[in-house]
Curated annotation (Swiss-Prot):
Similarity comment: family membership: Belongs to the GcvP family. C-terminal subunit subfamily.
Organism: Halalkalibacterium halodurans (strain ATCC BAA-125 / DSM 18197 / FERM 7344 / JCM 9153 / C-125) (Bacillus halodurans)
GO cellular component, one term: cytosol
Key word Transmembrane helix present: no
Protein name, entry field: Probable glycine dehydrogenase (decarboxylating) subunit 2
Length: 488
């Protein structure tokens, strides 16, 4: 018997079943052939599901129960900052003065929105130690690309057209080399040393007259603070390059350290991560970019400026790289981030990072006896473990991740960064209680013991989810992305 919770909505369909009633036609009925040219008409009716309203509700309610989000459970996805998104953000984003305006309205009619954008630009500049910020980029990767295009424009304006290479660490997010390529640069890899930090000697080897920039996350993707950042900045600047800050891990340093004070020239932030815009499920995101003074002329236009007591969009930017997104950024996400910043205040933001770092270190130390700890030092907001010892028992990191589903948890990031064997990257964020952390830790300890005593339990997981382990290789190579009715 078919499990109705697993059935496609097409499989619930019965001919003639109606899910909605339409009002009586109040215009003259005409054959569709007289209204639409024949070449645009289907020869057969589309195979749309015919279900009742109740069936429809039950079907999608059942599907929603199979989803996992921050509001439903712990989500320790490393390098993603899956923190709780305060619901006051949603209330403010729904204010009619924000939700019902149009980007083509006269500036005089949207002064509240322009003020919010201006004050958000100012706040982000202060938080990061930059001189000016654009809110246009739609997400982190576009922020990276925008920042690199600003660096390209700066070098070209100075006649420095031979700077074709961008340096990225071997532990970097994949978007870093991808953004460099899309921006027209060649990416060059710098190694990580035995302490999990950028190898300074190797950095000196790869830096040269063709270096446009070094892209860096600090703390890095291993969750470790690049303690030699000032020296690294000097190496890049002496070579004539720029230092780019990937803000993916900003949740570790709010109110404690600023990229601009470390020597960074360009910064992007992920407002949908650090500043509680909801994310997961495809967006939207927001990836503002901040720059130091010498790069301001190249920022995307327009930028919101303040004239006396009013605000306007400044298009008079002759050296701008132009727009990077239609209109003025993902405004709704920016409203949420602004609300979060105003709610927390400077001290609150600092506390966010202190708790994020505390939670990560607590989890790391409690789990270290059961999993390999590649870098045995204090971490920042996230940390990496290795499943090397479990691999020797026939249990892979993928198996551990699948087994966690049985406990109701979203797994951590796995097999990234690539320079850690059988990697698990865990980021608890500041919003989780000690009780939640302890429950997750106990689940991980149980899985470690199962790997030793009953490895098949882990190897065959998950056992309690609606759908068991999938053939992910076949799904990736031979995807079936649409429903097709098979007739005998």
């Amino acid at each position: 018997m078919m499990n109705k919770d697993q059935a496609l909505i097409f499989e619930l369909s019965k001919p003639g079943r109606v899910g909605h009633s339409l009002p009586e036609l109040d215009v003259l009925e005409q054959p569709v052939e007289t209204l639409i040219p024949a070449e645009f008409l289907r020869e057969e009716a589309p195979e749309l599901p015919e279900v009742s309203e109740l069936q429809l509700m039950r079907h999608y309610t059942a599907l929603s129960k199979r989803n996992h989000g921050v509001d439903s459970g712990f989500y320790p996805l490393g390098s993603c900052t899956m923190k709780y998104n305060p619901k006051i953000n949603e209330d403010v984003a729904r204010y009619p003065g924000f939700a019902n305006i149009h980007p083509y309205q006269p500036e005089a009619q949207v002064q509240g929105a322009l003020r919010l954008m201006y004050e958000l630009q100012t706040a982000l500049a202060e938080i990061t130690g930059m001189d000016e910020v654009t809110l246009q980029p739609a997400a982190g990767a576009q922020g990276e690309w925008t920042g690199l295009m600003l660096i390209r424009a700066y070098h070209e304006a100075n006649g420095d057209t031979n700077r074709t290479k961008v340096i990225v660490p071997d532990s970097a997010h994949g978007t870093n080399p991808a953004s460099a390529t899309v921006a027209g640069f060649e990416s060059v890899t710098v190694r990580t040393d035995e302490d999990g930090l950028v190898d300074l000697d190797h950095l000196r080897e790869v830096v040269g007259e063709d270096t446009a920039a070094l892209m860096l996350t600090n703390p890095n993707t291993l969750g470790l603070f690049e303690a030699h950042i000032v020296e690294m900045a000097a190496i890049i600047h002496e070579a004539g390059g720029k230092l780019y800050y990937d803000g993916a891990n900003s949740n570790a340093i709010l109110g404690i350290a600023r990229p601009g004070d470390m020597g960074f020239d360009v910064v992007h932030l992920n407002l949908h991560k650090t500043f509680t815009g909801p994310h997961g499920g495809g967006g939207p995101g927001s990836g503002p970019v901040g720059v130091k003074k010498e790069l301001i002329p190249y920022l995307p236009k327009p930028v919101v400026v303040k004239d006396g007591d009013s605000y306007r969009l400044d298009y008079d930017r002759p050296h701008s790289i132009g727009r990077v997104k239609p209109y003025y950024g993902n405004f709704g996400i920016n409203v949420r981030a602004y609300t979060y910043i105003r709610t927390m205040g400077p001290e609150g933001l600092r506390t966010v990072s202190e708790y994020a770092v505390l939670n990560a270190n607590y989890m790391m130390r409690r789990l270290a006896p059961y999993f390999d700890l590649p870098y045995d030092q204090h971490c920042k907001h996230e940390f990496v473990l290795s499943g090397r010892q479990q691999k020797k028992l026939g249990v892979r990191t993928l198996d551990i991740a699948k087994r966690l589903l049985d406990f109701g948890y979203h797994p951590p990031t796995i097999y990234f960064p690539l320079n850690v064997e059988e990697c698990l990257m865990i980021e608890p964020t500041e919003t989780e209680s000690k009780e939640t952390l302890d429950e997750f830790i106990e689940a991980m300890i149980q899985i470690a013991k199962e790997a030793e005593e009953t490895p098949e339990v882990v190897q065959e997981a998950p056992h309690h989810t609606v759908i068991g382990r999938l053939d992910e290789t076949t799904a990736a190579r031979k995807p079936i992305l649409r429903y097709e009715k098979i007739t005998q």
